[in-house]
Regions:
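N-terminal Rossmann-like or analogous alpha/beta NTP/dinucleotide-binding catalytic cores
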Residues: 1-8, 84
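Non-cofactor substrate-recognition interfaces
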Residues: 2-4, 14, 18-57, 98-249
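Residue-level signal for inorganic ion chemistry
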Residues: 6, 10, 65, 213
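Hydrophobic/aromatic-lined pockets within catalytic cores
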Residues: 7-11, 70, 217
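Short secondary-structure capping/junction motifs at helix and strand boundaries
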Residues: 8-19, 74-76
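Long, charge-rich boundary regions
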Residues: 47-102, 106-108
Length: 249
């Protein structure tokens, strides 16, 4: 009954999504069932593949779910777990033109104030535009990287913050505020199911973007005063805006 109500209100829908697939059991595995790229039950290789499945559009009613936790008689610990699981992100959608194309790459960011510090973009290996954005000279490297990524679960990708990997698509985006042309990369630290599956990278003010920029020799432009970007990113939101045109000061 509950599922039917969700379906009637457009909150239950079918979509093709990347899943963990055991090559031996021939079934979908939860992230917790994948250990170092293999199935915890049979030890066979686990790959990432697309599969059509029913989804619940939790983000469409996340605010109500979170707010109404105040009206239920749950213990505090459970309410905290629910709030963390549902999540609430406040930010902005930004569209970046693709150089030489009519397309615009959409991202969601909780730090639109750092837009002038964007020096590259990253899309998830499963992003629907991977093939379109990959140039001929980069195709072989991209295909090899995608194949490698399919052997890792999302849980491993999220947890492994020290490992830095990625590959150039060969395409470029245009920063809508600075007008700067910036490269588009593919990396497994971006997840297709989170936000739009693409990010604007601000290495001066995000630790994972910082590690990526250092690894690939990309520009790091601070736009919030504070910290020492020669050593690490300055992730704090407090500070004077710099190098940001009308936002500076």
């Amino acid at each position: 009954w509950i599922f039917l109500q969700l379906f009637k209100h457009g909150l239950a829908y079918k979509a093709s999504m990347p899943v963990n697939w055991c090559t031996s059991c021939k079934c979908v595995l939860a992230n917790e069932e994948v250990v170092e790229g293999v199935c915890e039950r049979c030890g066979s290789a686990v790959i990432r593949r697309e599969k059509s499945q029913w989804m619940l559009a939790i983000t469409k009613y996340a605010d109500r779910l979170i707010d109404d936790l105040d009206n239920v008689d749950y213990i505090s610990r459970v309410k905290i777990q629910q709030r963390n699981w549902i999540g609430r992100s406040v930010g902005a959608q930004v569209f970046f033109d693709i150089a030489g194309s009519e397309r615009k790459l959409e991202i969601f960011t909780t730090r639109p104030d750092t837009i002038y510090g964007v020096t590259f973009m990253v899309i998830a290996p499963e992003h629907e535009w991977v093939e379109e954005l990959t140039t001929a000279e980069n195709r072989e490297a991209v295909e090899a990287y995608i194949a490698e990524t399919k052997r890792r679960s999302e849980r491993e990708r999220i947890a492994d913050t020290k490992r830095v990997s990625g590959v150039k698509t060969g395409s470029y985006a245009i920063n809508p505020f600075s007008g700067r042309e910036i490269p588009i990369y593919i990396s497994d630290y971006v997840l297709a199911g989170y936000g739009t599956g693409a990010i604007m990278a601000v290495p001066a003010h995000d630790s994972r973007d910082y590690a990526f920029a250092r690894h690939f020799g990309l520009d790091i432009v601070p736009v919030v005063e504070g910290g020492n970007i020669e050593v690490e990113s300055y992730d704090a939101k407090e500070g004077k805006m710099i190098k940001s045109d009308f936002l500076s000061g």
